[in-house]
Amino acid sequence: MTNLKLDVQTADGNINGSVELPAEIFDREVSVALLHQVVNAQLAAARQGTHSTKTRGEVRGGGRKPFRQKGTGRARQGSIRAPHFTGGGISHGPKPRDYSQRTPKKMIKAALYGALSDRARNARIHVVSELVPGQTPSTKSAKAFIERLTERKSVLLVVSREDINAQKSANNLPGVHILAADQLNTYDVLKSDDVVFSVEALHTFINRASGAAQEEQN
């Protein structure tokens, strides 16, 4: 594993130094099975699970036998709310449930690092000093800068929570998804073609990852 160096791009098209991507985060082995499991768990946890159908015992009415048991020539029936009747209850229908799956933190972290490593190896991670120059939000400037960084349509923009200027500038751009450094996750990394970090957000993410690694060792 080797550390990767990336140039820091500025909004006016210049290069403002470089940053080093630590190998323990951005040069890990990628397990497709692990990525699949973690993404499935993440999507499952996002499901509301509030779906509910009524059984024959919950549908209003149907307490009286519709006709006598014998002598009519018809098949015997006990309730007009039986599942085979129109307007009857649903048999084996969905009920409210929790779809979330228990996924160990180490697996979640390994999947995220694997996804970032895949993007880094394919030159799909970019680092910028700022998204737009100055203190005034500009969607036009943000769009031009991102298009200069990559020609791909789907971009994940990772900025600090305090960078309101960047958030407002890119909020309405189609194909651009904005996250804070502590919100970074496997699904959004894999869903996006390129990942654009602000320098501040990148340092925040690396520091959080390093701190978590030290806690595990202790």
UniProtKB/Swiss-Prot annotation:
Entry keyword set: Ribonucleoprotein, Ribosomal protein, RNA-binding, rRNA-binding
Biased composition (Basic residues): 62-73
Alphabetized GO MF terms: rRNA binding; structural constituent of ribosome
Keyword rRNA-binding: yes
Superkingdom: Bacteria
Binding partners and assembly: Part of the 50S ribosomal subunit.
Protein name in UniProt: Large ribosomal subunit protein uL4
Natural source organism: Corynebacterium glutamicum (strain ATCC 13032 / DSM 20300 / JCM 1318 / BCRC 11384 / CCUG 27702 / LMG 3730 / NBRC 12168 / NCIMB 10025 / NRRL B-2784 / 534)
Lineage: Bacteria, Bacillati, Actinomycetota, Actinomycetes, Mycobacteriales
